[in-house]
């Protein structure tokens, strides 16, 4: 049996505490985690998804192309001594898979069915005691835009959750185009637009009202924005949304969601 010993001349015990927000996984929990990952990989494979393992580091400028403002602020970044560029530990694997699909898979036919799993790091408010290291597993279906494709992803998600033992869960279904249609053309400076998106993400109606009061937003667009925090729930939420939005982009997004639910 080997024993670790301290360096000659050491004056005290070595500090072995981990940084805040990260953890080791000892054998029992590590085995559970391995089981969950293996089970999900089997589900992904049955649906035709192939694994990719993205790089541990990314150029910050490339990574930020696929990150929202919230994740940009949570990204661990530092100077690369070799290149002199800013690099980062990805806080989300999704933008990395998008980069791989856009730059490395030209010799493969569309659609791409790609799956992944791994650790990601994110800055967190220390006073809140939040984790900074997460396990993320997921899939990306690229190059096939249809209600049937969306329904396929939802059905596979349900199968994956059941396979790992989940029995009570809720799946939130949304459409980025619906929000884009509401926000397009809003007469807001860049800083106010970012603040508005953050308030929408947290369903902060008070902040939305304040931002709209501070800028000359037309009444119809104001009504659409202020309705956003209330537009959640079952299929009835789509009916409520249809009475609120008055732009073609959002209307088409609602129509697509209706068709997805019909396929399911």
Language-model features: where?
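Acidic, His- and aromatic-enriched active-site or binding-groove loops in soluble protein domains
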Residues: 73-82, 187-212, 217-218
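Positively charged, Gly/Ser-enriched RNA/tRNA-binding surfaces
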Residues: 2-9, 29-49, 58-59, 83-84, ...
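Generic N-terminal amphipathic, Lys/Arg-enriched alpha-helix
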Residues: 16-26, 241-243
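Short, conserved phosphate-binding/catalytic loop or strand-edge motifs used
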Residues: 131-137, 173-181
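Short acidic, glycine/serine/threonine-rich loops at helix termini
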Residues: 63-65, 126-132, 181-186
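Residue-level "edge-of-site" marker
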Residues: 57, 174, 196
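Polyanion/phosphate-binding surface patch
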Residues: 21, 55-87
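Charged, compositionally biased N-terminal leader segments and the immediate start
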Residues: 1-17, 188, 195
């Amino acid at each position: 049996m080997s024993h670790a010993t301290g360096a000659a001349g050491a004056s005290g015990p070595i500090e072995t505490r981990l940084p805040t927000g990260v953890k080791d996984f000892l054998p029992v929990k590590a085995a559970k985690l391995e089981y969950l990952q293996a089970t999900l990989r089997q589900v992904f494979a049955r649906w035709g998804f192939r694994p990719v393992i993205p790089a541990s580091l990314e150029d910050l400028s490339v990574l930020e192309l696929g990150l929202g403002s919230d994740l940009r602020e949570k990204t661990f970044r530092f100077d690369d001594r070799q290149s002199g560029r800013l690099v980062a530990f990805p806080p989300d694997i999704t933008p990395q898979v998008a980069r791989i699909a856009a730059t490395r898979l030209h010799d493969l036919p569309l659609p791409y069915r790609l799956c992944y799993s791994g650790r990601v790091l994110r800055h967190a408010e220390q006073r809140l005691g939040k984790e900074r290291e997460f396990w993320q597993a997921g899939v990306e279906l690229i190059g096939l835009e249809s209600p049937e494709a969306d329904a396929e992803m939802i059905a596979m998600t349900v199968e994956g959750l059941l396979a790992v033992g989940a029995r009570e869960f809720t799946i939130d279904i949304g459409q980025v185009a619906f929000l884009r249609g509401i926000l397009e053309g809003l007469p807001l400076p860049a800083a106010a637009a970012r603040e508005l998106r953050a308030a929408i993400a947290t369903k902060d109606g008070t902040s939305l009202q304040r931002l709209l009061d501070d800028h000359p937003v037309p009444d119809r667009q104001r009504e659409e924005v202020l309705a956003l925090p209330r537009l959640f729930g079952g299929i009835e939420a789509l009916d409520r949304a249809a009475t609120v939005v008055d732009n073609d982009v959002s209307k088409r997004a609602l129509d697509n969601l209706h068709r997805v639910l019909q396929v399911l």
